[in-house]
């Protein structure tokens, strides 16, 4: 049966809701903006409130007989060649947890790349899953981690034949991509499922010059944040499933366990609209973004002291398998300024927001929403940054450990350490103790310390010096990291 991608069930249902002038005696209590605070209405506009209706008993009837959401999800699945798709309004942080709970349970093993996002670790804590960490490919020269390779997963399965499946992150926030097809083959040779955290890859299915995406590569579950590289609203996420290793109803059940019973129709509408936009114009829009990104990369490379990381930097033996050029990662070590200091200056003095920031890099993601006006402002700001860089060089330095020093020993299950008896100790006394909390430089959100890992002096020094240089640590109990929560 042919699929009509000009349709957008959620958006159409919202139009119908307004046309009918339905009178609501249900939540939300603002009653189509009438009860909202005037100052909020002035800032947000009434359109936000007019679109904020119940999914069941509002957008659809109380028994969801119109199947508004189901039809939108089927269209999304068709657009990206998945067998089944589910929308979520709690971000991929929820979606990836639901995927993990569909594959492994308490005290069961799951192979996980150690470059996973903190939401994956949260899933381990909640479920009591035992992680078998698969080491990323470390680029010691650039102090950067790339996804593990198929042979890394094969070795981990050989050492842990009782593992229930695997999870890999690809692309990374830096744009480095794994050999997903090879990893899927390793998993499927054992009749085990592969989960791909593809939060940064919503755009990948829509242009042949972009890296292969998870469903095409044979993954069983793929988690995607439509709000990151797509046109969705914040928290808009989908997960796709295919094959016979993870029943779709099981995945939906696990998502229902974690998700809200009051999903945002606004977020659903953003997901539905993104799918239609990409199904009808995706190749054109992504092609334009790729051309623009290539121009921007070339222009930045001409600025003294700046270097744009490219395929030659990220791909090759012992590195990543593929590369997404839209996250424009700029190495600014040549101008002697940390990424933290540079990002703060760009925001304060040029009103330019950078996304990814670390001790030597800043990142500007280029999407189909950019044009030569936005990128022109970016380039002008970067030229000015390079010019005034000598004035910013008095910032504290970050003591970055070697790849071997960054790897901590896991001596307890994350869940056991997180929920067990714990105490706060001065950071000077924490080395050798077992962490009872996550400590995560953000962005990109990859924990440096996990619950259950044995703390070491190099990692603690890295975090303390990073904090002094401008690193953001959102999760430790002591935000100044003068103390650390450890297992008693």
Show where each model-derived region lies:
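Generic beta-strand/beta-sheet core signal
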Residues: 113, 134, 169, 197, ...
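Conserved small-domain helix->loop->beta segment predominantly found in fold-type I
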Residues: 284-363, 367-368, 390-409
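Conserved PLP-enzyme active-site core in the AAT-like
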Residues: 7-13, 19, 23, 82, ...
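PLP-dependent enzyme catalytic core of the Aspartate aminotransferase-like
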Residues: 345-349, 355-488
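N-terminal "arm"/small-domain region of PLP-dependent enzymes with the aminotransferase-like
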Residues: 1-67, 444
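Short acidic (Asp/Glu) and glycine-rich catalytic loops that position anionic groups and cofactors
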Residues: 248-252, 270-279, 321-326, 356-362, ...
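Short, glycine-/Ser/Thr-/acidic-enriched flexible segments
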Residues: 32, 173, 228-229, 244-246, ...
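Conserved N-terminal alpha-helix of the aminotransferase class I/II PLP-enzyme fold
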Residues: 44-94, 115
């Amino acid at each position: 049966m042919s699929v009509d991608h000009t349709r957008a069930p959620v958006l159409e249902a919202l139009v119908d809701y307004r046309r009918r002038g339905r009178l609501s005696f249900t939540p939300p209590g603002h009653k189509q903006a009438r009860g909202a605070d005037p100052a909020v209405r002035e800032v947000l506009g009434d359109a936000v409130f007019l679109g904020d209706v119940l999914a069941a008993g509002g957008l659809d009837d109380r028994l969801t007989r119109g199947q508004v959401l189901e039809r939108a999800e089927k269209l999304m699945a068709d657009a990206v060649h998945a067998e089944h798709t589910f929308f979520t309004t709690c971000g991929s942080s929820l979606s990836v947890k639901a995927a993990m709970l569909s594959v492994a349970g308490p005290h069961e093993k799951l192979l996980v790349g150690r470059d996973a996002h903190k939401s994956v670790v949260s899933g381990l804590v909640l479920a009591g899953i035992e992680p078998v960490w698969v080491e990323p490919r470390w680029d010691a020269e650039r102090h950067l981690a790339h996804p593990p390779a198929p042979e890394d997963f094969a070795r981990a399965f050989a050492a842990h034949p009782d593992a229930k499946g695997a999870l890999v992150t690809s692309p990374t926030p830096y744009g480095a991509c794994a050999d997903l097809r090879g990893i899927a083959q390793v998993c499927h040779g054992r009749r085990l499922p592969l989960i791909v955290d593809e939060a940064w890859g919503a755009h990948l299915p829509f242009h042949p010059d972009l890296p292969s995406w998870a469903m095409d590569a044979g993954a069983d579950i793929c988690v995607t944040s439509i709000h990151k590289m797509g046109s969705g609203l914040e928290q808009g996420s989908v997960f796709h499933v295919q094959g016979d290793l993870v029943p779709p109803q099981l995945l939906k059940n696990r998502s229902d366990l974690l998700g809200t019973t009051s999903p945002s129709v606004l977020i659903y509408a953003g997901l539905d609209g993104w799918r239609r936009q990409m199904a009808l114009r995706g190749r054109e829009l992504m092609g334009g973004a790729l051309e623009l990104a290539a121009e921007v990369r070339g222009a930045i490379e001409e600025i003294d002291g700046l270097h744009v990381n490219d395929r030659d930097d990220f791909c090759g033996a012992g590195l990543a398998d593929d590369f997404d050029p839209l996250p424009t990662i700029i190495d600014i070590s040549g101008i002697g300024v940390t990424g933290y200091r540079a990002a703060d200056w760009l925001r304060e003095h040029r009103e330019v927001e950078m996304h990814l920031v670390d001790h030597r890099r800043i990142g500007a993601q280029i999407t189909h929403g950019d044009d030569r006006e936005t990128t022109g402002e970016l380039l002008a700001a970067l030229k000015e940054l390079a010019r005034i860089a000598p004035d910013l060089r008095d910032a504290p330095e970050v003591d970055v450990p070697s790849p071997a020093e960054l790897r901590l020993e896991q001596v307890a299950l994350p869940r056991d350490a997180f929920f067990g008896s714990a105490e706060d100790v001065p950071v000077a006394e924490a080395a050798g103790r077992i962490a009872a909390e996550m400590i995560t430089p953000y962005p990109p959100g990859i924990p440096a310390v996990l619950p259950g890992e044995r703390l070491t002096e190099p990692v603690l020094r890295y975090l303390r010096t990073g904090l002094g240089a401008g690193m953001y640590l959102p999760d430790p109990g002591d935000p100044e990291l003068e103390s650390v929560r450890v297992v008693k």
